[in-house]
């Protein structure tokens, strides 16, 4: 955009500030701890219940002082409008904090300026106290589909000399300034709080509460509301006034919503950068100024997405030196202009936005240059595509499991999981999922900051997960005899035979073989061989021929879970002494006792256990150790924390195998034991280890081995950031 038009847009905001009393220093309202953020996009619209599951699983990343959800790309029929209105009109969502404020807000800020095609109050629960996870009554929310009246927009353009500005861009700016006025009158940060704008943009919605994010789904009854992208935030403010929902994330810009995990060290500097451009923060949070920065560079400066990211997370040092020369010159200019407005400190953004001029929806994640906050990306390719971003992998796992229950074309195991490298010359510390129409269907492509596509495994043959033909599938006699032969040997023999055969087998062959192994595993030897072979199939890399590796892994994990669940419970008295394995779950936890006869392995089904506390699976494992158990298998994990903690010193004879989606702080403080993680691990892994052995057949998250004093550590995947401090 030409510099004189940029100046005019900035100057047009001056009158907004005429009656604003500026404090000498604009300070944040609250400090924030380690929040939880998650987002996903789908090539087909999917229901709000699928953002509920990862939000609930990240419940302990919030403290009930703020939760929020945003969505982009709706189904017009669900909103009671036409496709034309949905795509062309702004969706204006206003939170009403007092019962009698609606008429006044409409009279002063809506009907004088906008043509309203439709409006409606959002449905809500009859009694907010019946919805778990709410701390105060959420606001009533009214949704308006609006366009600026022609005569109003003409006057706005003339007054601000916007004749050379695209008319739709001028309308965007009017909408933005009108929302500022509404907020200033009805929700001044230090004054009365009656109403505020939740979101303003085309085909986008933001909802937020004082409480937890998952409560929004039930309170506003959006379980079945469908959209192409969803993001959520669990807030963890650590000080300040946090009893109003406006401070919760996401924060809005025109056509965008942003959530944030972290805390700026230079909030005042960033605010000054905005004030110099006549942009005044109203809600006094890091996340608000982040959204304002992004909106400024996107709409006013017309920066490309690459250059917006560079301004917010500048490339530096060796990475800068490795950039192409043409980028260095431009990046130097961007950094010189925006360095004082570049967020400093630990942060990770997830942004969803509508890009109407490209007929595109976007979901993107940006990490700070030092990667000081956890982040993970994933992509599930196929007939239905899913792109995912989260502050922890277990939230991504929860999303895919939820989606797959509704649509079996979606595999619970993604094709690829990866991390961004902040401020790097390789990926720029950001990845973008673009959802746009291709040959009449919505499809997703994923690129890094520089526009380089993310490489995915070569497309393979998908498994029909709902097919049950494998249940009656007749294996040829050679396969059947080999399975019987190798099942009686070491698990390595069995694994090698299956591994070498997978490329030539059909999916039905593979599933029937897995099932046969489980069904024939009756005694300790057979069960151990099956668990060992399945674990290696889950952990190791091997050729799968024309099949999808992610589908093979899902089938293995499904069968392994079936095997674990088939084991006898602790209180099952009908099994003989030939089986060393005993099962316990949440419902049977009161039957915990010490090992009897030849029992030696306690198998804990962690599903449905709380993630932490006295009733957690980690606490159960500790109690079991005190009663004499030394070998453990933990499966069905959905983010449970502290596995292996609290067992005390000299635990050399303790062995723990962990499957599925374990949570933070696993193996922290161990002294001698062996823990094997048969999947990716999470954050705060292995802190203050004294002695022992830790094996991870996947990636590890942030703050890996903080304060560790010893031990043997093996990681097959990568370490996302800040290990070994």
Predicted feature locations:
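Long, distal/terminal scaffolding or interaction modules
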Residues: 467-725
């Amino acid at each position: 955009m030409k510099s004189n038009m940029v100046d005019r847009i900035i100057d047009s905001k001056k009158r907004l500030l005429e009656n604003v009393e500026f404090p000498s220093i604009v300070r944040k309202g609250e400090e924030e701890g380690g929040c939880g953020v998650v987002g996903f996009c789908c090539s087909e619209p999917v229901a709000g219940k699928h953002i509920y599951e990862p939000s609930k699983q990240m419940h302990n990343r919030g403290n009930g002082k703020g939760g929020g959800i945003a969505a982009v790309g709706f189904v017009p029929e669900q909103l009671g409008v036409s496709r034309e209105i949905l795509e062309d009109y702004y969706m204006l969502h206003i939170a009403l904090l007092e019962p009698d404020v609606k008429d006044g807000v409409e009279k002063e800020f809506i009907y004088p300026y906008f043509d309203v095609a439709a409006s409606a109050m959002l449905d809500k629960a009859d009694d907010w106290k019946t919805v778990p996870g709410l701390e105060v009554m959420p606001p009533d929310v009214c949704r308006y589909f609006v366009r600026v009246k022609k005569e109003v927009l003409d006057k706005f353009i003339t007054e601000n000399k916007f004749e050379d500005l695209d008319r739709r861009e001028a309308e965007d700016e009017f909408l933005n300034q009108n929302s500022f006025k509404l907020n200033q009158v009805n929700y001044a940060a230090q004054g009365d709080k009656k109403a505020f704008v939740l979101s303003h943009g085309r085909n986008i919605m933001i909802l937020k509460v004082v409480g937890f994010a998952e409560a929004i789904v039930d309170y506003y009854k959006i379980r079945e509301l469908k959209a192409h992208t969803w993001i959520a935030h669990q807030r963890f403010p650590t000080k300040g006034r946090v009893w109003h929902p406006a401070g919760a994330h996401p924060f809005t810009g025109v056509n965008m919503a942003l959530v944030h995990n972290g805390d700026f060290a230079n909030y005042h500097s960033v605010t000054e950068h905005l004030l110099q451009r006549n942009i005044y923060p109203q809600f006094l949070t890091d996340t608000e100024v982040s959204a304002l920065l992004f909106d400024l560079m996107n709409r006013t400066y017309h920066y490309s997405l690459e250059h917006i990211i560079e301004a917010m997370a500048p490339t530096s040092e060796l990475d800068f030196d490795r950039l192409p020369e043409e980028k260095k010159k431009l990046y130097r200019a961007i950094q010189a202009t925006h360095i004082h407005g570049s967020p400093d400190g630990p942060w990770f953004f997830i942004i969803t936005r509508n890009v109407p001029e490209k007929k595109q929806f976007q979901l993107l994640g940006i990490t700070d240059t030092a990667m000081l906050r956890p982040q993970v990306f994933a992509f599930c390719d196929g007939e239905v595509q899913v792109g995912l971003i989260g502050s922890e992998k277990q939230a991504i796992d929860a999303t895919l499991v939820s989606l797959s229950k509704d649509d079996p074309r979606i595999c619970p195991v993604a094709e690829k999981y990866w991390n961004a490298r902040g401020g790097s010359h390789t990926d720029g510390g950001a990845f973008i999922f673009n959802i746009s129409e291709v040959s009449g269907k919505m499809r997703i492509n994923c690129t890094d900051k520089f526009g380089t596509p993310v490489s995915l495994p070569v497309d393979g043959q998908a498994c029909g997960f709902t097919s049950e033909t494998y249940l009656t599938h007749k294996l040829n006699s050679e396969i059947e005899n080999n399975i019987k032969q190798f099942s009686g040997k070491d698990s390595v023999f069995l694994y090698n035979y299956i591994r070498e055969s997978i490329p030539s087998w059909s999916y039905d062959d593979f599933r029937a073989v897995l099932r046969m192994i489980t069904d024939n595993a009756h005694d300790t030897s057979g069960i151990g061989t099956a668990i060992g072979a399945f674990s290696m199939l889950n952990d190791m890399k091997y050729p799968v021929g024309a099949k999808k590796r992610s589908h093979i892994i899902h089938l293995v994990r499904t069968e392994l879970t079936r095997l674990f669940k088939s084991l006898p419970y602790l209180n099952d008295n009908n099994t003989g002494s030939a089986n060393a394995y005993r099962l316990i779950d949440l419902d049977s936890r009161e039957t915990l006792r010490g090992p009897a006869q030849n029992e030696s392995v306690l198998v804990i089904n962690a599903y449905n256990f709380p993630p932490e506390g006295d009733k957690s699976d980690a606490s159960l494992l500790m109690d079991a150790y005190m009663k004499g158990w030394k070998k453990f298998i933990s499966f069905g994990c959905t983010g449970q924390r502290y596995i292996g903690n609290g067992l005390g010193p000299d635990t050399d004879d303790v062995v723990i195998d962990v499957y599925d989606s374990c949570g933070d702080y696993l193996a922290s403080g161990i002294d001698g034991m062996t823990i094997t993680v048969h999947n990716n691990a999470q954050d705060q892994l292995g802190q203050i280890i004294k002695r022992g052995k830790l094996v991870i057949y996947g990636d590890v998250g942030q703050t890996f081995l903080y304060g560790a004093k010893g031990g043997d550590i093996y990681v097959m995947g990568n370490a996302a950031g800040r290990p070994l401090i």
